[in-house]
UniProtKB/Swiss-Prot annotation:
It comes from the Eukaryota. A motif (PLRP) lies at residues 38-41. Residues 1-246 are annotated as: Sufficient for E3 SUMO-protein ligase activity. Residues 1050-1061 are annotated as: Important for ubiquitin binding. PROSITE patterns: ZINC_FINGER_C2H2_1 (PS00028), ZINC_FINGER_C2H2_2 (PS50157). GO terms for molecular function: DNA-binding transcription factor activity, RNA polymerase II-specific; sequence-specific DNA binding; SUMO ligase activity; transcription corepressor activity; transcription regulator inhibitor activity; zinc ion binding. This is E3 SUMO-protein ligase ZNF451. E3 SUMO-protein ligase; has a preference for SUMO2 and SUMO3 and facilitates UBE2I/UBC9-mediated sumoylation of target proteins. Plays a role in protein SUMO2 modification in response to stress caused by DNA damage and by proteasome inhibitors (in vitro). Required for MCM4 sumoylation. Has no activity with SUMO1. Preferentially transfers an additional SUMO2 chain onto the SUMO2 consensus site 'Lys-11'. Negatively regulates transcriptional activation mediated by the SMAD4 complex in response to TGF-beta signaling. Inhibits EP300-mediated acetylation of histone H3 at 'Lys-9'.
Length: 1061
C-alpha cells in the first residue's frame, strides 16, 4: 500500500471555475473513500481553524480550492426555510384579501337589500312593517341548512348545532291547534298555559297586505288612490257614494264556517278545501252558492280577537275530567294519576259563536243604524220612512257593522266601549231617572239624600244647570268620583280579593295579582286567578257570580249606582227642596271619602287590613299603618339570588357566606312582592299603598235575627299551609275548616281511597262503594271495611278519612310563618318497611295504627301538635311507588343542609329525594323554595325521621336503607349518595358487585350547577350505566378500564344535560 495521503488528495475534486458549480450541488453522500490505511493523525494533513469565518484547507491543495462543510449546508437549509415561509405569508395575504373582499360584498348586498325592504314597506303602517321585518328575519337561513348556531355562549352547548325539524310542531293539548317552528317556542307556549280553543289568530301568519273596500258597492281596491278615483267616478250617481265615505281596510280573510283568520286569501281557500268548510255558518238572504273567504276589516279583526281573549277556557283530563290550571299541575297529574289519558282544552264559546256579533239583517244609510233582526228593521222603516238596505251575505254584514261602528259619533259605539260591554261590572245597578217638564228637576233616591227626618215621602229636586257631572254611590250612601273607586270600595267592604291559582296568594287589587302572575309565575296565563271571599272562604270563578254571592250572603254593600249631579252643588239643601220638605233637613254635603264613614258618624272601629287589628280612632290606625315596625314582612332582597330577608344583617351574612362577600341589596315589599332598587322608591310605595290600607268597620245598631252563636269567632293561632289552623277556639270553625280541607285534599289527590281487594283507587267514597259493590260483590262483607284511605305523599294507609287528614296535618303540613319551636327535636322512632308485607299483615298493622290513632285523639284536644308522643311506628315510602322512579338520591343533611338552595333548576321527573339527619343537626324545610315545594307536593321527597344523636347516625341509616332497597328494587334504578364522608366509597364498590349503578358525590367539591347536571344526567343514562355495570361484573379483570370508560360516559352525559339546560 502506498502513501494514503496522495489517495486522499486525489479523492478531493479539483478546484477551479469549472468545478465551482458542480461542487455547489454535491451532497455529503457523493464523497467516496477508495482505500484505507493505517490510522494516522489527521492533523498531519488538514489545517484546523478555530474560527468559523475561515475556510478549512489542506496542506497540499491550492488556496482557491474550497469545500462545503456542515455550516454551509445549515445556511442553505435556513435560506430554503425563509423562502418557504415567505411564500406561505404571501398565500395568507392573498386569502385574507379575498375574505375581506367577500365580506365587503356581503355588507354591500345586505345594505342594498335593506334599502329595498325599506322601499317596499314604506307604504305600510309601523305595525305591518315590524311584522314584515320579523317574518323576513325568521326566514333567513343560518350558518348551516336546518341548524341553529349556538352563538358565543357555548359553555352549555358544546355539542355544536341543534337540529330543527322543518315540519311545524303541534301543541299536544287537544283542541289547542297551535303550531310552532321549534321546540323552544312550544315549551314557552306550554309554560304560559295559553291553550284557548277560541283563538282565531292561530292561522294568522306572515305580513298583512292591505286593500280598501267600498261599503256601498263592496268593491275592493289595492291602493287608496284607486279608491279615491272610484269615489270620484261614482259621485254623480245617487247611490250613497261621496268623497267623505271612508273605506274599510281589509287586512285578513276569515273562513265562513269556523271564522279562523288568514293573512292571504289563498291560504283561506286552501284551509276551506282541506277541511271541507264550503258551507256557511250564518245564512243571510237567498244566497245558496258556494261559500268564499270573507274579507275581514281591521276593526272587525281587532274586535273579534279581543272578544275571543275574554272567553274563559279550561284544560281538563279526558279520563277523570279534572280541571288542570297550570303546566306543572298538568305534568304531575298525568305522571302520577292518569298515565294513559290526555289533556283537552274546552272553551265556553267557539269562534263562530263570538263572530255572531257581526251578523246583521238590515242597514239604514240615512241614519247609519244597523238592525239585528227583521222586526226592528220593519219598525224603523215604518216609523222613519227611510229605505233600509237588506243584507244578503256575511261579508256585507261585517263591512256594514264596521262602517256603522266607526262612523257613528256616539261614544257608546267606540271599539273600547264595545269591548267594555263584556266587562260590565255585575255589581252596578241602573237607577231610573224621571224628568219633570215643569221644573226640569232630576229625581234623587231618598237613600242618597241621607235625610234624618224619614216621615217625608216626597221626591227632592234640584234645578238643572248646564254643567252636569257623574257620581257613583254605594248602597251605604258613600259617594265616589269614579266607577273604579266605588267598585274597589264594594270589593273591600265585602272582603273580596283575588287569589292566585298557582300558589294561593291573595291580593286586594287586580293590578297587583296580574303583576304577581307576570313576575312570579313567568306570565303563565295572566288570568289564572280566582275571586276570593275572605268572609265566606269561597272561591268564585267568574266576576258575574260576585253579584249573586254578595246579594245572598252579604249585606250593606251589595251594589252601587250612577247618578248625574250638578257640578259645584252639594246634595239637596233646604233652599232646593220642595215645599213638602221642611227646613230642618241637613244642608251639609256628603263628601268623597274612601276611608272614613258618612257624616252620620255611626259607631264602630277602625281596622288595619294588613294585620286586621282594631283601633278606636282614625289617628291610631293611621299611625299604626304608617309605621314600618307595625308589620313583620320581608323588606330586603338579595340581588344575586332574589332571596327575601326580614333584617338587613341577615342579608349581609347571606352575601358573605353565599356570594363571596359581594353585597348587593334590593328593597323588597313582602306585602305585594315588588322589588325596588333604592330605599326611597320602596318607602314611597309603602306610603302610597300600604300606609292607608285601613277601613272603618261600623257596628250594627239595628236588631238582628242572628244570635251570638252566629257571629264568627276570630281564630288567632298560626295557620298551616293547607288552610287549617294549628289550634282552634271555636269547635264550629274547626269543623268547617277540617271538612273543607278534607274535600280539597281528596280533590287534589293528596288523599285517596284504595280498594283492599285490588289496586283500584277513587277520589270519593261514593265511587269506591260503587266499585266494591260491582266488582267485589261476592267477596264483600258488610261488617268489614273493604277500603283504606292512603296518603298521597308517603302512601300510608288509614281506615277513616279523619285519621288520614290528621296524619297529613302532622307530617306534611307546615306553618305559613314557622317558628323555631315548631321544628324541635324528636325522639327516636321505630322504622319498618311495610310495602312488601302480606295482606293479612297489612290489615293487622293498620288495625294497630288505627287503635293508636284513636288513643292519640282522645289525649289531644283541638290541637295538631303531637310532640308528646313517645313512640311512633313510621312507614317508609311504598316500594311499589319507588319502583316507578328512575333515580333514588340519598341526601345526608348533616353535610349538605342547604341542598335545595344550591339547585339552580328542577330535577328530572322520576327523581326521588330521601333525606337523612342525625347528631346535633336540626334540618328545617326551606322557606319559599319552589323546587322543595314541588317535590314535596308530588310525593318525590321523604324526610327520614331523626336518627340518634351520634355523629355518624345518618351515615349508618343511609347504608342500611340503601342496602334494603338494593334487594327489592329493579337493578336499572341508580342510587346516588350525597355525603362528604369517604366511607361511602366502599358502599359504591359493594353496589357494583350487585350490578347496581351507584354514585357517591361530595358536596364540598361540587357547585350547584354541576351537581344538578350530574343528578339529571344519571337519571337520563340509567340504561347505559346499567349495561356498563353488567359488563364490569362479567369482566372483573378489567376494572380500571371500566372505571375510566364510565367516567368518560358520565362526562358525555353531563355535557348533554348542560346542552339541554
Amino acid at each position: 500500500m502506498g502513501d494514503p495521503g496522495s489517495e486522499i488528495i486525489e479523492s478531493v475534486p479539483p478546484a477551479g471555475p469549472e468545478a465551482s458549480e458542480s461542487t455547489t450541488d454535491e451532497n455529503e453522500d457523493d464523497i467516496q473513500f477508495v482505500s484505507e490505511g493505517p490510522l494516522r493523525p489527521v492533523l498531519e494533513y488538514i489545517d484546523l481553524v478555530s474560527s468559523d469565518d475561515e475556510e478549512p484547507s489542506t496542506s497540499y491543495t491550492d488556496e482557491n480550492i474550497k469545500r462545503k462543510d456542515h455550516i454551509d449546508y445549515q445556511k442553505d437549509k435556513v435560506a430554503l426555510t425563509l423562502a418557504r415561509l415567505a411564500r406561505h405569508v404571501e398565500v395568507e395575504k392573498q386569502q385574507k384579501e379575498e375574505k375581506n373582499r367577500a365580506f365587503r360584498e356581503k355588507i354591500d348586498f345586505q345594505h342594498a337589500h335593506g334599502l329595498q325592504e325599506l322601499e317596499f314597506i314604506r307604504g305600510h303602517s309601523d305595525t305591518e312593517a315590524a311584522r314584515l321585518c320579523v317574518d323576513q328575519w325568521l326566514k333567513m337561513p343560518g350558518l348551516k341548512t336546518g341548524t341553529i348556531n349556538c352563538g358565543t355562549k357555548s359553555s352549555f352547548r358544546r355539542g355544536g348545532h341543534t337540529w330543527v325539524s322543518g315540519k311545524p310542531i303541534l301543541c299536544p293539548i287537544m283542541h289547542c291547534n297551535k303550531e310552532f317552528d321549534n321546540g323552544h317556542l312550544l315549551l314557552g307556549h306550554l309554560k304560559r298555559f295559553d291553550h284557548s280553543p277560541c283563538d282565531p289568530t292561530i292561522t294568522l301568519h306572515g305580513p298583512f297586505f292591505s286593500s280598501f273596500a267600498c261599503v256601498v258597492c263592496y268593491k275592493k281596491f289595492v291602493t287608496q288612490q284607486q279608491y279615491r278615483d272610484h269615489l270620484f267616478d261614482k259621485e254623480a250617481t245617487d247611490d250613497g257614494h261621496n268623497n267623505n265615505l271612508l273605506p274599510q281596510i281589509i287586512q285578513c280573510f276569515a273562513c265562513p264556517n269556523c271564522f279562523l283568520l288568514f293573512s292571504r286569501k289563498e291560504e283561506c281557500s286552501k284551509h276551506m278545501s282541506g277541511k271541507n268548510h264550503f258551507h256557511q255558518s250564518f245564512k243571510l238572504g237567498d244566497n245558496k252558492g258556494i261559500a268564499h273567504p270573507i274579507s275581514f276589516p281591521s276593526f272587525a279583526k281587532k274586535l273579534l280577537i279581543s272578544l275571543c281573549k275574554d272567553v274563559p277556557f279550561q284544560v281538563k283530563c279526558v279520563a277523570c275530567h279534572k280541571t288542570l290550571r297550570s303546566h306543572m299541575e298538568l305534568t304531575a297529574h298525568f305522571r302520577v294519576h292518569c298515565r294513559n289519558a290526555g289533556p283537552v282544552a274546552v272553551a265556553e264559546k267557539s269562534i263562530t259563536q263570538v263572530a255572531e256579533k257581526f251578523i246583521l239583517r238590515g242597514y239604514c244609510p240615512d241614519c247609519n243604524q244597523v238592525f239585528v233582526d227583521e222586526t226592528s228593521t220593519q219598525n224603523h222603516k215604518q216609523n222613519s220612512g227611510h229605505k233600509v238596505r237588506v243584507i244578503n251575505s256575511v261579508e256585507e254584514s261585517v263591512l256594514l257593522y264596521c262602517h256603522s261602528s266607526e262612523g257613528n259619533k256616539d261614544p257608546s259605539s267606540d271599539l273600547h266601549l264595545l269591548l267594555d260591554q263584556s266587562k260590565f261590572s255585575s255589581l252596578k245597578r241602573t237607577m231610573s231617572i224621571k224628568e219633570s217638564s215643569s221644573l226640569e228637576c232630576i229625581a234623587i233616591p231618598k237613600k242618597k239624600m241621607n235625610l234624618k227626618d224619614k216621615s217625608h215621602e216626597g221626591v227632592a229636586c234640584v234645578q238643572k244647570e248646564k254643567s252636569v257631572v257623574k257620581t257613583w254611590f254605594c248602597e251605604c250612601n258613600q259617594r265616589f268620583p269614579s266607577e273604579d273607586a266605588v267598585e274597589k270600595h264594594v270589593f273591600s267592604a265585602n272582603t273580596m280579593g283575588y287569589k292566585c291559582v298557582v300558589c294561593g296568594k291573595v291580593c286586594d287589587d287586580s293590578g297587583v295579582i296580574r303583576l304577581h302572575m307576570s313576575r312570579i309565575h313567568g306570565g303563565a296565563h295572566l288570568n289564572n286567578f280566582l275571586f276570593w271571599c275572605r268572609t265566606c272562604k269561597k272561591e268564585l270563578t267568574r266576576k258575574d257570580t260576585i253579584m249573586a254571592h254578595v246579594t245572598e250572603f252579604h249585606n250593606g254593600h251589595r251594589y252601587f249606582y250612577e247618578m248625574d249631579e250638578v257640578e259645584g252643588e252639594t246634595l239637596p239643601s233646604s233652599s232646593t227642596t220642595l215645599d213638602n220638605l221642611t227646613a230642618n233637613k241637613p244642608s251639609s254635603a256628603i263628601t268623597v271619602i274612601d276611608h272614613s264613614p258618612a257624616n252620620s258618624s255611626p259607631r264602630g272601629k277602625w281596622q288595619c287590613r294588613i294585620c286586621e287589628d282594631m283601633f278606636d280612632s282614625q289617628e291610631y290606625v293611621k299611625q299604626h299603618c304608617m309605621s314600618l315596625a307595625s308589620h313583620k314582612f320581608h323588606r330586603y332582597s338579595c340581588a344575586h339570588c332574589r332571596k327575601p330577608f326580614h333584617k338587613i344583617e341577615t342579608l349581609y351574612r347571606h352575601c358573605q357566606d353565599e356570594h363571596d362577600n359581594e353585597i348587593k341589596i334590593k328593597y323588597f315589599c313582602g306585602l305585594c312582592d315588588l322589588i325596588f332598587n333604592v330605599e326611597e322608591a320602596f318607602l314611597s310605595h309603602y306610603e302610597e299603598h300600604h300606609s292607608i290600607d285601613y277601613v272603618f268597620v261600623s257596628e250594627k245598631t239595628e236588631t238582628s235575627i242572628k244570635t251570638e252563636d252566629d257571629f264568627p269567632v276570630i281564630e288567632t293561632s298560626n295557620q298551616l299551609t293547607c288552610g287549617c289552623r294549628e289550634s282552634y277556639i271555636c269547635k264550629v270553625n274547626r269543623k268547617e275548616d277540617y271538612s273543607r280541607c278534607l274535600q280539597i285534599m281528596l280533590d287534589k289527590g293528596k288523599l285517596w281511597f284504595r280498594c283492599s281487594l285490588c289496586s283500584a283507587t277513587a277520589q270519593n267514597l261514593t265511587d269506591m262503594n260503587t266499585h266494591i259493590h260491582q266488582v267485589h260483590k261476592e267477596k264483600s262483607d258488610e261488617e268489614e271495611q273493604q277500603y283504606v284511605i292512603k296518603c298521597g305523599t308517603c302512601t300510608k294507609a288509614f281506615h277513616d278519612p279523619e285519621s288520614a287528614q290528621q296524619h297529613f296535618h302532622r307530617k306534611h303540613c307546615f306553618l305559613q310563618k314557622p317558628s323555631v319551636a315548631h321544628f324541635g327535636s324528636e325522639k327516636s322512632n321505630l322504622y319498618k318497611f311495610t310495602a312488601s308485607a302480606s295482606h293479612t299483615e297489612r290489615k293487622l298493622k293498620q288495625a294497630i295504627n288505627y287503635s293508636k290513632s284513636l288513643d292519640m285523639e282522645k289525649g289531644v284536644e283541638n290541637d295538631l301538635s303531637y310532640q308528646n308522643i313517645e313512640e311512633e311506628i313510621v312507614e317508609l315510602p311504598d316500594l311499589d311507588y319507588l319502583r316507578t322512579m328512575t333515580h333514588i338520591v340519598f341526601v345526608d343533611f348533616d353535610n349538605w343542609s342547604n341542598f335545595f338552595g344550591h339547585l339552580p333548576g328542577h330535577l328530572n321527573q322520576g327523581t326521588f329525594i330521601w333525606g337523612f339527619q342525625g347528631g346535633n343537626t336540626n334540618w328545617k324545610p326551606p322557606l319559599n323554595c319552589k323546587i322543595y315545594n314541588y317535590l314535596n307536593r308530588i310525593g318525590c321527597f321523604f324526610l327520614h325521621p331523626r336518627c340518634s344523636k351520634r355523629k355518624d347516625a345518618a351515615d349508618f341509616a343511609i347504608c342500611m336503607h340503601a342496602g334494603r332497597l338494593d334487594e327489592q328494587l329493579p337493578k336499572q334504578i341508580p342510587f346516588t349518595i350525597l355525603s362528604g364522608d369517604q366511607g361511602f366509597l366502599e358502599l359504591e364498590n359493594q353496589f357494583k358487585k350487585t350490578q347496581r349503578p351507584a354514585h357517591i358525590l361530595n358536596p364540598h367539591h361540587l357547585e350547584g350547577d354541576m351537581m344538578c347536571a350530574l343528578l339529571n344526567s344519571i337519571s337520563d343514562t340509567t340504561k347505559e350505566c346499567d349495561s356498563d355495570d353488567n359488563m364490569g361484573a362479567k369482566n372483573t379483570s378489567i376494572g380500571e378500564e371500566f372505571i375510566s370508560t364510565e367516567d368518560v360516559e358520565l362526562e358525555e352525559a353531563i355535557r348533554r344535560s348542560l346542552e339541554e339546560m
